[in-house]
């Protein structure tokens, strides 16, 4: 993981040959980036040691977010400056509402989570705040603001 960095992206490129924009963002976010990547929850998901009950709760919470993420993408498709950007975002939206949604449904079935549970689940306060930020930035903000918030959603 990149070490802490507080300079510009140009400075980062000069000090890190072959460095990528995402490397610079992660370096600027230290130590929080490493803390998130090494958090016990993140590690347990990655190595398969997450208890099924905890994973089911996580999936239910994440599923409450998917509807708002789909709406966010809809706003951004509408605001995208041209057909290439609209196509890329609508492709993501199609994937989210088909294959990713199917993953959730298969997972809920495998974990024994009844449809009434995940269909009526309320968002927790952190998810709700993040969803509201996404919807506000993409619906009321500029295209760039919406994309910036979308990036953070996809990295979390």
Regions found by a protein language model. Give the residues of each.
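Short, charged, low-complexity loops and linkers
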Residues: 12-21, 46-56, 139-141
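Short alpha-helical hairpin
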Residues: 5-9, 26-50, 69
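Alpha-helical bundle segments that constitute or directly flank the non-heme di-iron/ferroxidase center
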Residues: 30-35, 49-79, 98-99, 147-156
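Hydrophobic alpha-helical segments
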Residues: 2, 12, 17-21, 26-28, ...
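Generic alpha-helical secondary structure signal
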Residues: 19, 23, 31, 39-40, ...
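Active-site-proximal alpha-helical scaffolds that flank and shape metal-associated catalytic sites
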Residues: 13, 84-156
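Surface/interface-facing alpha-helical segments and adjacent flexible terminal/loop regions used
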Residues: 2-5, 119
């Amino acid at each position: 993981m990149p070490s802490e960095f507080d300079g510009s992206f140009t400075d980062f490129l000069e000090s890190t040959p072959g460095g990528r924009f995402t490397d610079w963002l992660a370096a600027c976010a230290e130590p929080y980036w490493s803390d998130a990547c090494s958090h016990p929850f993140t590690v347990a998901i990655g190595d398969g040691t997450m208890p099924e009950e905890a994973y089911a709760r996580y999936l239910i919470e994440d599923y409450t977010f998917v509807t708002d993420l789909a709406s966010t993408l809809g706003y951004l498709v509408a605001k995208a400056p041209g057909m290439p950007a609209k196509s890329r975002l609508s492709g993501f939206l199609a994937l989210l509402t088909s294959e990713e949604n199917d993953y959730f449904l298969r997972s809920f079935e495998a974990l024994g989570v009844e449809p009434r549970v995940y269909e009526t689940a309320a968002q927790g306060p952190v998810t709700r705040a993040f969803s509201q930020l996404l919807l506000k930035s993409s619906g009321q903000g500029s295209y760039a603001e919406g994309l910036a918030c979308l990036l953070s959603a996809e990295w979390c």
